[in-house]
């Protein structure tokens, strides 16, 4: 900005720096590679008539992978430092049934059970009262984001026109090799909202 607009105020200066990371899940979970030689989230998260995962053991292994301490790969929930960075996140999943099944599994996981799971996909979890998605997320985060931990599950809601200041990351667990980059970008910018929380300026997002 300074090179092209020297002397002019930078309108983007207050935005947190966007960091984009990718994981090669196909290298770890070979059976979910599709014809484009890319990882297929829709198949990976496929549910049966009882709304449980067809590949439940693999999904459970994936959640364990996210929380596995690995110095080389730096999985996002591998230690307390990372869990504090990703205290409030948005997870994009393929569909409503998949979100319900994942919500149930997260609530049983030894690490993720300490996060409040907010399912805003469709009408949310069956045992939860239907309400405005943004209100549900903000209530779960509460007045002090440092005192809570949340994971918001969505397959489309809250991806345009809203801002949740406490969100620091979005996990894209949907789409495929052929998904347009523009659809990803529109979603990930939800976490680039400027914020000052308990005196700390949000400088990074993921």
Language model features with spans:
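Interdomain helical connector at the RecA1-RecA2 junction of SF1/SF2 helicase-like NTPases
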Residues: 1-89
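Short, conserved catalytic or adaptor-binding loops enriched in Gly and charged residues
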Residues: 8-13, 108-112, 199-200
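"Short basic amphipathic alpha-helical interaction patches in structured regions
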Residues: 35-43, 52, 92, 103-107, ...
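Short, well-ordered amphipathic alpha-helices
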Residues: 59-77, 100-107, 137-138, 169, ...
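N-terminal cationic-hydrophobic initiation segments that often serve targeting/anchoring roles
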Residues: 67, 81, 107, 142-145, ...
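Conserved helicase motor "Helicase C" RecA-like lobe of SF1/SF2 P-loop NTPases
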Residues: 85, 94-121
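Generic beta-sheet signal
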Residues: 87-91, 149-152
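Conserved RecA-like P-loop NTPase helicase motor core
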Residues: 116-206
């Amino acid at each position: 900005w300074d090179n092209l607009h020297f002397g002019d105020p930078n309108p983007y200066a207050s935005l947190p720096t966007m960091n984009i990371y990718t994981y090669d899940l196909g290298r770890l979970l070979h059976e979910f590679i599709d014809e484009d030689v890319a990882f297929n989230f829709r198949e990976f998260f496929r549910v049966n008539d009882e709304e449980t995962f067809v590949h439940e053991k693999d999904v459970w292994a994936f959640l364990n992978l996210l929380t596995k301490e690995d110095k080389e790969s730096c999985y996002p929930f591998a230690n307390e430092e990372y869990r504090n960075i990703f205290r409030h996140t948005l997870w994009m999943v393929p569909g409503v049934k998949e979100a319900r099944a994942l919500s149930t599994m997260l609530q049983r996981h030894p690490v993720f059970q300490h996060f409040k799971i907010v399912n805003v996909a469709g009408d949310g979890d069956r045992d939860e009262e239907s309400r405005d998605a943004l209100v549900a997320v903000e209530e779960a985060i509460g007045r002090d984001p440092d005192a809570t931990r949340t994971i918001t599950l969505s397959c489309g809601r809250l991806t345009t026109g809203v801002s949740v200041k406490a969100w620091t990351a979005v996990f894209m667990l949907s789409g495929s090799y052929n998904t347009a980059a523009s659809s990803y970008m529109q979603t990930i910018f939800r976490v680039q909202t400027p914020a000052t929380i308990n005196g700390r300026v949000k400088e990074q997002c993921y």
